[in-house]
Amino acid sequence: MAGTDREKALDAALAQIERQFGKGAVMRMGDRTNEPIEVIPTGSTALDVALGVGGIPRGRVVEVYGPESSGKTTLTLHAVANAQKAGGQVAFVDAEHALDPEYAKKLGVDIDNLILSQPDNGEQALEIVDMLVRSGALDLIVIDSVAALVPRAEIEGEMGDSHVGLQARLMSQALRKITSALNQSKTTAIFINQLREKIGVMFGSPETTTGGRALKFYASVRLDIRRIETLKDGTDAVGNRTRVKVVKNKVAPPFKQAEFDILYGQGISREGGLIDMGVENGFVRKAGAWYTYEGDQLGQGKENARNFLKDNPDLANEIEKKIKQKLGVGVHPEESATEPGADAASAAPADAAPAVPAPTTAKATKSKAAAAKS
């Protein structure tokens, strides 16, 4: 077949596919508009930089896992607050039945407009997730946690019954269904996960996450969060130093790390992170115990400098913008003239995210094909 005949045959096939499955079902990559990746800021500048795109990517599956009390829910609630500040709709599926509304409020979450579900079993939870995602009205949905998505058969069965692989099959089926809908509706799904230990592992890490392997494959970003140090004020513990490793990243280079402070009752210390990154990148000068920025003293000791930036948010926004511009993350050239703090606009909701139809039955598919032929 000659080259022109092959091209004509391909064009005819593409036209037939578009007629049968709708416009955009197949296209040449050059015809697709190359839009920057939309993100939701995490609340930590260091983590936004480590992610490579300025935050958690929209329309993707994200897994956050780590030991108990490492900051998984805190990190996720900051993402929820940032999505809401940008005008987005957020749902929180609390399978653990452990969400503290007062703590969420302190972190900046608008609890009055947060859509909350506390399902009875794993099937119900994932069905709710599927329906909410297909509505096309959400910007972010959080599932806390995968380990708490207990299959109905396990709940209704006896305590000693064995249900090998039941939860893994449930997660695999759910992710197959929702991944496409997430991408079409630009909804981000954050799955919080717990750690377990494999028995009899002699070499390598014995740690593994719950829910089988499906989530590892479907997740575009996987974050391993660990508490590395306890922050103290005298003898009193006031927070934790936390390290997050980007174990998997499909939107930027992986294996980068970020460290930040989580203060009890306050969440991630954005100002503390800005001081650390400001010193690292040469914007904030540290001489002895004093921190200075462009000749102005921020304070003696990190705690005083942190409080100064907290009282002067415009200055904090200015330092953050300079750090992100230097590292080429999260700030686009056309945004350089916008007001401070406007980088969260990259998390703005899609104005007209289409509702994603539920999967059609084989019968409906045949009738559509017959209509296309006629």
From Swiss-Prot:
An MF annotation (GO) of this entry: ATP binding
Region Disordered, annotated ranges: 327-374
Residues noted as binding ATP in the record, renumbered to the chain: 66-73
GO CC annotation: cytosol
GO biological process, alphabetically ordered: DNA recombination; DNA repair; SOS response
Subcellular location: Cytoplasm
Bias type Low complexity, positions: 338-374
Keyword Oxidoreductase appears in the UniProt entry: no
Keyword terms of this UniProt record: ATP-binding, Cytoplasm, DNA damage, DNA recombination, DNA repair, DNA-binding, Nucleotide-binding, SOS response
Highest taxon, organism lineage: Bacteria
InterPro entries: AAA+_ATPase (IPR003593), DNA_recomb/repair_RecA (IPR013765), DNA_recomb/repair_RecA_CS (IPR020584), P-loop_NTPase (IPR027417), RecA-like_C (IPR049261), RecA-like_N (IPR049428), RecA_ATP-bd (IPR020588), RecA_C_sf (IPR023400)
Family: Belongs to the RecA family.
NCBIfam families with a match to the protein in the record: tigrfam_recA
Known function: Can catalyze the hydrolysis of ATP in the presence of single-stranded DNA, the ATP-dependent uptake of single-stranded DNA by duplex DNA, and the ATP-dependent hybridization of homologous single-stranded DNAs. It interacts with LexA causing its activation and leading to its autocatalytic cleavage.
UniProt name for this protein: Protein RecA
Protein source organism: Streptomyces lividans
